Amino acid sequence: SGEYEDAADSDIVIITSGMPRKAGQSRLELAQANVNILKDITPQIVKVAPNAIYIIVSNPVDVLTYVFHKISGLPERQIIGSGTILDTSRLQSVLAKRFRISPKNVHAHVYGEHGDSSFVPWSLVHIANNHVNVYRDSSPDRDRIKWDNENEYAGIEEYVRTSGGQVIK
């Protein structure tokens, strides 16, 4: 908190303003209230820090990143939406625990809009430079990590997709 002038000439500004999501409320239900807040603050913050890189983390992050871009008039290269970055970290963490390896060896990403429409392209998931199925089947621990691909993948995706909502509850 503070005054907009406190951010004058900042290199990076992180936008966290917005109403918090309530239990059972979707990110998209937050949209109008948080768009109105963003419309109010954007001209003021951009005026004092026109050259900053802006990182949008308020929900719904994808909508607000787009709105911030349109309102601010700043070039795309100055605006970052956190999007599915947190979801990707959750996915990598779940797979690392499942395979008992470092998350550094998990190469997997979540795509789409942060929230209910996100998805994991399983054909691109690699563990220690092997496709997830190859790694799973060749692991000395394979009896413990056997799974039904379709159900296991769906369960992991659902966990990743709903974890943010669990924090709110």
Question: Model-derived features: where do they sit?
Answer:
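Short, internal active-site loops enriched in acidic
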Residues: 5-6, 60-62, 113-116
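N-terminal Rossmann-like NAD(P) cofactor-binding module of classical short-chain dehydrogenase/reductase
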Residues: 11-14
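Conserved NAD(P)H cofactor-binding loop of Rossmann-fold oxidoreductase domains
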Residues: 17-19
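C-terminal substrate-binding/catalytic lobe of Rossmann-fold NAD(P)-dependent dehydrogenases
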Residues: 72-78, 88-169
